């Protein structure tokens, strides 16, 4: 640099400023893409949560319907005058360990009544802006002190804000996944229990028809 003329030094400064400006533009573009991906992920998790809730409600309704079906089968046995030996009576399905583990006893501590910790929703891309900002004096050391450096400062300020948003989104995504995993297992257990209950009811109905 000592061998460069003042004009060459100025040209070099402008070249570095142009390169730095393009770098901040690329960084900002990548940050915006990451934020958009995070928003889409949160939206998809929210939609998945609604679907899981509907599935679980459907399984709960099947469970209730099966309870009524079993009562009907018991009444039909009585109406048909079938005498069942006490040792051959069908055991109440809801007294079984598998049922109690899945549905509990209907009290406040039953699996169905346990509410997992839910993160605060982020909808329509509206994210809280972080309170942290640029360090005192700005992000860059000004050399040319022109509009390019103004844009660089603005770009880096936006990047800092987006990084704060990404941190919040990562926490929300992690919390939502942690909340949904137990529900997915609960749904699987309920589906398995309902299947077993339906199989037993079908066997009772077939036996009743064949009698």
Swiss-Prot record:
Matches recorded under SUPFAM superfamilies: SNARE fusion complex
Chain positions found as Phosphoserine: 5-6, 20, 23, 34, 110, 161
CC per GO annotation: adherens junction; azurophil granule; cilium; cytoplasm; extracellular exosome; focal adhesion; mitochondrion; neuron projection
Chain coiled-coil ranges: 23-76
Protein location: Cell membrane; Synapse, Synaptosome
Tissue expression pattern: Ubiquitous. Highest levels where found in placenta.
Residue span(s) of domain t-SNARE coiled-coil homology: 14-76, 146-208
Sorted UniProt keywords: Acetylation, Cell membrane, Coiled coil, Lipoprotein, Membrane, Palmitate, Phosphoprotein, Protein transport, Repeat, Synapse, Synaptosome, Transport
CDD domains assigned: SNARE_SNAP23C (cd15884), SNARE_SNAP23N (cd15895)
Residues bearing PTM N-acetylmethionine: 1
Signal peptide annotation: none
GO molecular-function terms, A-Z: SNAP receptor activity; syntaxin binding
Stated family: Belongs to the SNAP-25 family.
This protein's name: Synaptosomal-associated protein 23
């Amino acid at each position: 640099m000592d061998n460069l003329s003042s004009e060459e030094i100025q040209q070099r400064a402008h070249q570095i400023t142009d390169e730095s400006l393009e770098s901040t533009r690329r960084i900002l573009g990548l940050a915006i893409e990451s934020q958009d991906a995070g928003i889409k992920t949160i939206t998809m998790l929210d939609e998945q949560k609604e679907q899981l809730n509907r599935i679980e409600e459907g399984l709960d309704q099947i469970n209730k319907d099966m309870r009524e079906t079993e009562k009907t089968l018991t009444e039909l046995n009585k109406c048909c005058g079938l005498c069942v030996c006490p040792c051959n009576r069908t055991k109440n399905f809801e007294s079984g360990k598998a049922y109690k583990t899945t549905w509990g006893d209907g009290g406040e501590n039953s699996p169905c009544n346990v509410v997992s910790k839910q993160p605060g929703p982020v909808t329509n891309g509206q994210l809280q802006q972080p309170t942290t900002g640029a360090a005192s004096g700005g992000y860059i050391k000004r050399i040319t002190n022109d509009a390019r450096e103004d844009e660089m400062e603005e770009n880096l300020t936006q990047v800092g804000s987006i990084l704060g948003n990404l941190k919040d989104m990562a926490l929300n995504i992690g919390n939502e996944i942690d909340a949904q995993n137990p529900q997915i297992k609960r749904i699987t257990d309920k589906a398995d229990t309902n299947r077993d209950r339906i199989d037993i009811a079908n066997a009772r109905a077939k036996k009743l028809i064949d009698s």
